[in-house]
Amino acid sequence: MAEKENYDHPVYKHVKDIKDADAVAWAFVNKNKMVQFPFKFPEVGPDEIRINTLYAGLCQSDVHTVREIWGPCLYPMAPGHEIIGEVAIVGSNVKDFKKGDLVGFGTLRTCCEKCEYCVKGKENLCREVPEVFTYGKYWGGYATAMQQPAKFFFKLPPGFKLEKGAPLFCAGITTFYPLEKFLEPEMKVCGVIGCGGLGHMAIQFLHKLGHEVVAFTTSENKKDLLKKLGADKIVISKDDAQMKAAATTIDFMVNTIPSNNTNFNKYISCIKRGGKLIQVGMPAFDDEMRINVNMLVSCEIEILGSCVGPRKPTDKMVDFCAKNDVYPIVEEFPFEKIPEAFEKLENGRPFFRCVVNMKDFAEKNGLKK
């Protein structure tokens, strides 16, 4: 029996003719089917902005969302939380943005501004309002335009590379923020576990910040590229001899691997006494990490989690990347080939990050408004 296809949405109105649409999304109408979805927005609210999407990154979190790995999904769903755009319409209360501004937008879309976390500048930990994240009923970057609260847009500085910058608003801040929060100056030797979309960003940040970087990877064929990105040493983690040689050499370790099938103890054994392991890779909600507690206690090793990042560190990251030419390696796809990019992402074959050029399709179809 075929799965039901849902075209009714509580916020966005599906229209049949693209000429009547404000935008077109690639939306999932059920767990397994993605379609081009012309739609109309509600009126822009006083505290909102509508942008024309220029570039949108694809993230593994999109897969987790629409495949319901992280729980029930509201269909139709147009995901995407790595977004570069141009401001098209500004709400009446919005003072910090104007039409034509180039902006970025990421995983967080709103917060309460009042809870104990918000008042400390930790909006990423706010759970006091619904739809904090760009994963729910308010659509994201898989559409030629997007409408969201103004307070989580970020102005882009002159010289910012628009075609490469979208993944910075997820992969970038996910790896930049824990360095801001947890990395101490005396921690000179830093390791990165997993050298994919997140890991290759962590390597670049650590290198530009002046640390010695050790990259842990299973991919022999990435060695030369990782060195160009800033890795001082490459450890092939499936090689027992190399892992043994790396024992107790790392002050600060960033783990980008989300899988619960990983033998974390072999990585923990590489951390110095008093060192830190920062977990940023996020698996399914019921996955667990198995570790040797004796090793943690006897060596006073800290394990810490980090969830994307608040607004101030994101602004700082944007400026840092523009000034230091730190960007992800991306494969670019046209809007028409989002399903192809998504399939490549889901099957673990992108060359670091997939980015979709949204602007060409929008301009060709009269959707830039």
Show the residue positions of the predicted features.
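Glycine-rich beta-strand-centered segment in the early N-terminal region that forms part
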Residues: 40-56, 69-116, 157-160
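Glycine-rich phosphate-binding loop and adjacent beta-alpha segment
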Residues: 209-211, 258-329, 358-369
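Adenosine-nucleotide cofactor-binding segment
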Residues: 189-195, 207-266
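N-terminal Rossmann-fold NAD(P) dinucleotide-binding loop
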Residues: 199-200
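C-terminal hydrophobic helical "lid"/dimerization subdomain
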Residues: 2-21, 208, 265, 311-369
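NAD(P)H dinucleotide-binding glycine-rich loop of Rossmann-like/cofactor-binding domains
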Residues: 38, 111-193
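Short glycine-/small-residue-rich Rossmann-like dinucleotide-binding loops
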Residues: 57, 91, 108, 239, ...
